[in-house]
Structure formats: structure tokens, C-alpha cells
UniProtKB/Swiss-Prot annotation:
Its job: Required for the chloroplast avoidance response under high intensity blue light. This avoidance response consists in the relocation of chloroplasts on the anticlinal side of exposed cells.
GO biological processes: chloroplast avoidance movement; response to blue light
Protein family membership: Belongs to the WEB family.
Gene: PMI15
Organism of origin: Arabidopsis thaliana
Pfam families: WEMBL
Record-given protein name: Protein PLASTID MOVEMENT IMPAIRED 15
Keywords: Coiled coil
Lineage: Eukaryota, Viridiplantae, Streptophyta, Embryophyta, Tracheophyta
């Protein structure tokens, strides 16, 4: 049985090492640790019970051994005794003792078989506890792998957060550079517009002066034309007046001289006006060239203002795009910061749970080491008990053989005694026919009186023992009922704790799924293109799940109720009392 149980445990351990267990949560690991601790307690209790049963069996075997030795001594005494009636009584006692010894041997065999069953059940429980320890080890490794994956996800989220912050800084730098360029271009455009306005004002002033000059030129030209007409009229009059007299000639000469002088003055004035007109024409030509240049400058300024307007509009579009990108990055940054805070809180929780798992792992290692030591000790003890049981069985078999031989001899002696008793009975019947009294020996009289008193005492003692046994049975039933009630309460409490642990595990799984979903959304939003209007990020609501059904847990303890057996009677005292 023990070898098979050990082989099964080795096979299960090898199969468990070959399996790849999935990643589990810390709450499952803690629950498994609690269950393993409970099973360790149950194993220790069952081991203590098996040790007590073993001690009882050893005590019973020692008592049986003593009783067998006493029987052997009594057999020797019976063989050595010389009295025939004493041999008869001792033979009867030996038969009773033999029957009692056989009953005791049957009880001892039952106890030994029960001890073997208890040892096999304890070994099976120990194998199950070792399997639980292996499962705990794999679960702790899975928790460590989960923590490493969470750390990697946190590092990736931190890198994304840094990338978003760097993109925000670069966008702000570009925005500032564009604003600076825009301000510089606006200042240049304003300077150009001021210069052009000044030029336009100067050109308008020159145009007004040219208009004044044109007006003066027109007036001078009208004066010149009038003088020319007057000169023509004067020449006509001079031709008419040539045929008149000398008196009139002198007057005309004088008037002619005056007209000539005025004509010369007019000529000089006209020449000056002509020069002024030429200079005015030159000035007008220069003004026209300047006006053409101003027109060209105005056209070029209009083109430049249109280009600057386009550039400003493009800059406005770029600034709007940058503002939208900044808003998007801000929203992403807020989402990433919220996710990072949640991941950091989860990481702290997982770090705490990992520390608990490490502590429980160390405790499990210590318990495993203690299990191994206890395993070796129990192996040695079981081997010793097996050897002792085999030795005691061989001794019992030898004693039984001796008892069979003694029984055979006693049967022969009984036959002889029966023949003698029949002879005595016949002789006494023959004597009783002649007289009303029967003569018996003093030994027979004393034996019968003692036997009657001892029978009364034994009957009274048996009645008292039966009453005490009934009381003890009632007390044991009460204690058993109390134990069953406490065990039922403990089982209900353990079921409630298991349900709470399952609920916590599902809640932690839902939060982890939500966090993973948010991280995936952030990744998809960062990869997606186009403008996304920033919206306030709401709180994450945990997913409500249905309450788990109450199933009977696989790890419910199996309680071994060891009934109180009747104590092996001390045969030496019984025989001494009977004798």
C-alpha cells in the first residue's frame, strides 16, 4: 500500500511538472495557500490520531503478550499441579482465557487493519498536500510572470507618456516659432506699408504741385496768346498807319517804341515762360515716371500683401491644426496619466500581493521541508511498526500454536476428567440410594463457596462497568455532536470565505480587463489619424457580474472519526482475581 501510494505521488508530481499552468491572480494563490495550510492541519491531526491509535494498538499488543505469558505460566502451573479437581478447574479457566485471548487477538487484528487504513489515508492526504504545494509553486511563478508583464506594460505606457510629452513640447516650440515668424513678417509688412504711404503722399504732393504748375502754365500760355494777338493787331495797325502824316508818324513811332519795348519785355517774359514751361514739362515727365513707378510699386505691394495674406491664412490654418493637435495630445496625456495612475495603483497592489506570495512561498517551502522530514520519519516509523507488527504476529502465531497444543492436552485431560467425574457421579448415585446425604471433600466445598462469591462480585463489577460504559458512550456521543456542529460552522465559514475570494478575484479580473481595454484604446487612438474633438474622460465603472454559485469545494476536509474501542482487559488481573 505504502509503495503504491509513493509511486502514485511521484507520477502525479512528474505529470504536474510537465503541465504548463495558466497565469492566475494573487487572490487564487492566497486561497490555495490557505487551503494547503488547512490541509496541513488536517494532516497533522490525522497523524496525531494515527499515532494515538498506534499507541493503543501497541499497548493492546503488550497486554496480549503479557496475557499470553501469564497463560503459559498458568499452563505450566496446571501441568505441574497434582490435584485432579484443581486441574479440571484450571482447564476450564484456560478455556475461558483462551476464548478471551482469541477475542482480544481479533480486536487487535481489527485495530491493526484500521491503523493500516489510517496510515494509507494519511499517505494519500500527504500526497495531495504535496500536489497542492506544487500547484502553489506554479501559481506563484504565474503571479511573478503576471507581475513582470504588468511592469512591461507600465514601462510601455511610460514611454508613450514621454513620447506624448515630447510631441507636446515640439508642438509648442513650432507654435512659438510660427508666432515669431508671423510677428516678424507683420512688422516688415507694416514698415513697407508705412514707406509706401509716405511715397504715395509725396507723389500726391508732387502731383498737386504739377497741377498748380499746369494751371500757371495755362495762364501764361493764355497771356502769350493774348500778347501775340495784340502784336498781330499792332502790326496791322502799323501797316494801316504808314500812309498817314508825319505828325502821326512821330506819335506812332513813340507808341511803336513803347510797344516795341513792351514787346521785347513780353518776348522775354514769353521766353521765360517757355523755359518755365519746358522745365514744367520736364518736371511733369519726371512726375509721370514717378507716378508709373508708384503704380508699379502699388501693384507689387498689392501682390506682396496678397502673398502675405495667403501666408497669414496658411499660418492661421497651421496654428489651428497645431491647436487641435495640442488639444488631442492633452486629452491623450490625460488619459495616459489616468491609466498610469491606475496601473501604478494596480502595480502597488500586485507588489503587496507579490510580497505576500513570497512570504507564503517561503512558508510553503518551510512546510515542504517539514513535510519531507515528516515523510522520512513516518516512513521509518511505518517500517518499524510493520516490523513490530510482523514480529508480534509471528509471536502470536507461535503462542497460538502453543495454545493449540495446550488445548489438545487439555482436551485429553478433560476426557480423563469426564471419565473420572462420571465414575464419581455413579459412585455418589450408588451411595445416595442408600443414604440421603452426599459427602463431598473440603476442597470442593471451599471451591464452590468461593466461586459463588466471586461470581457475585464479577456480576456486580460487570453491571457497574456497563453503566460507566453507557455514560462514557453518552459523553462521547455528545462530544461527537459538538465536534460535528463546530465542523459544520467552520465549513460554512470556509465556504463564505471562498465565495468572498471568488468575488474579489472576479472584481480584480474585471478591473484588469478595463485597464487593458483602456491601454488598447490609447494605442489605437495614438495610431489613428485625423482630428478628434477632446472630450472629458469619465470614470470607469466596474462591470457587475452575477454572484457565483455555491458549489461544494473540492478541497473540503475529510474527517476521520475514530470510535472509542473497548479497552483490552488486563488478563493478568482477571486471572489473578478468578484464581
Amino acid at each position: 500500500m505504502l509503495n503504491r501510494a509513493m509511486e502514485n505521488s511521484d507520477m502525479k508530481r512528474n505529470s504536474s511538472t510537465l503541465l504548463d499552468l495558466p497565469v492566475v491572480k494573487s487572490s487564487l494563490v492566497v486561497e490555495a495557500i490557505h487551503m494547503s495550510r488547512k490541509k496541513l492541519g488536517w494532516y497533522n491531526e490525522s497523524r496525531r490520531d494515527s499515532e494515538t491509535v498506534k499507541a493503543r494498538v501497541e499497548a493492546g499488543l503488550s497486554e496480549v503478550k503479557k496475557s499470553v505469558e501469564e497463560l503459559a505460566l498458568l499452563i505450566k502451573r496446571s501441568n505441574r499441579s497434582a490435584g485432579f479437581q484443581e486441574k479440571d478447574m484450571e482447564v476450564l479457566k484456560m478455556e475461558e482465557k483462551y476464548a478471551e485471548v482469541m477475542r482480544v487477538l481479533e480486536v487487535v487484528k481489527e485495530e491493526v487493519s484500521r491503523v493500516k487504513l489510517d496510515v494509507s489515508s494519511v499517505l494519500i492526504e500527504r500526497v495531495a498536500a504535496e500536489e497542492k504545494v506544487e500547484e502553489l509553486r506554479f501559481k506563484t511563478e504565474g503571479g511573478l510572470r503576471l507581475l513582470e508583464s504588468l511592469k512591461k506594460e507600465i514601462e510601455v505606457a511610460n514611454e508613450e507618456h514621454l513620447m506624448v510629452a515630447l510631441g507636446k513640447i515640439e508642438a509648442l516650440k513650432g507654435y512659438k516659432e510660427i508666432e515669431r515668424q508671423r510677428e516678424g513678417k507683420a512688422i516688415k509688412v507694416l514698415d513697407l506699408l508705412v514707406e509706401r504711404n509716405k511715397r504715395i503722399k509725396n507723389m500726391l504732393e508732387e502731383a498737386e504741385r504739377s497741377k498748380d504748375i499746369e494751371i500757371e502754365l495755362f495762364e501764361t500760355s493764355t497771356d502769350v496768346e493774348m500778347l501775340e494777338t495784340q502784336l498781330k493787331l499792332f502790326k496791322k495797325m502799323e501797316r494801316r498807319v504808314q500812309g498817314r502824316d508825319s505828325s502821326s508818324m512821330s506819335r506812332s513811332n513813340r507808341s511803336f517804341g513803347r510797344g516795341k519795348y513792351s514787346l521785347s519785355v513780353l518776348k522775354e517774359v514769353t521766353e521765360g515762360k517757355k523755359e518755365e514751361l519746358a522745365s514744367v514739362k520736364v518736371e511733369i515727365f519726371r512726375v509721370m515716371t514717378v507716378m508709373d513707378a508708384l503704380r508699379n510699386e502699388i501693384i507689387r505691394a498689392r501682390d506682396e500683401t496678397a502673398c502675405l495674406g495667403k501666408i497669414l491664412r496658411e499660418d492661421d490654418v497651421k496654428i489651428e491644426k497645431l491647436n487641435s493637435k495640442i488639444l488631442i495630445e492633452k486629452s491623450k496625456l490625460e488619459v495616459v496619466s489616468i491609466a498610469e495612475e491606475r496601473i501604478s495603483s494596480l502595480a502597488e497592489n500586485f507588489v503587496g500581493s507579490l510580497e505576500k506570495i513570497k512570504k507564503s512561498r517561503n512558508a510553503a517551502k518551510k512546510e515542504e521541508f517539514l513535510f519531507k522530514e515528516e515523510k522520512t520519519v513516518t516512513k521509518a516509523e511505518t517500517q518499524k511498526t510493520k516490523l513490530d507488527i510482523d514480529k508480534k504476529e509471528s509471536e502470536l502465531n507461535s503462542k497460538l500454536d502453543e495454545l493449540e497444543k495446550v488445548k489438545h492436552t487439555e482436551a485429553l485431560v478433560l476426557e480423563k476428567l469426564e471419565s473420572l467425574v462420571e465414575d464419581m457421579m455413579e459412585s455418589r448415585e450408588m451411595e445416595s440410594e442408600h443414604c440421603s446425604t452426599i459427602t463431598i471433600s473440603r476442597f470442593e466445598y471451599e471451591y464452590l463457596s468461593k466461586h459463588a462469591s466471586q461470581a457475585e462480585e464479577t456480576a456486580e463489577k460487570k453491571v457497574a462497568a456497563a453503566a460507566a460504559w453507557v455514560e462514557a458512550l453518552k459523553a462521547s456521543t455528545k462530544s461527537f455532536l459538538m465536534k460535528t456542529e463546530t465542523l459544520m460552522r467552520e465549513s460554512e465559514m470556509t465556504k463564505a470565505e471562498e465565495e468572498r475570494e471568488v468575488f474579489r478575484m472576479e472584481r480584480s479580473l474585471s478591473t484588469k480587463r478595463l485597464v487593458e481595454g483602456e491601454i488598447q484604446k490609447i494605442k489605437r487612438n495614438s495610431e489613428a489619424e485625423g482630428y478628434i474633438s477632446p472630450k472629458p474622460v469619465g470614470k470607469f465603472t466596474p462591470v457587475q457580474r452575477g454572484k457565483p454559485r455555491r458549489y461544494s469545494s473540492v478541497g473540503t476536509p475529510t474527517f476521520f472519526v475514530i470510535k472509542k474501542k473497548k479497552k483490552v482487559p488486563r488478563l493478568a488481573k482477571f486471572f489473578s482475581r478468578r484464581s
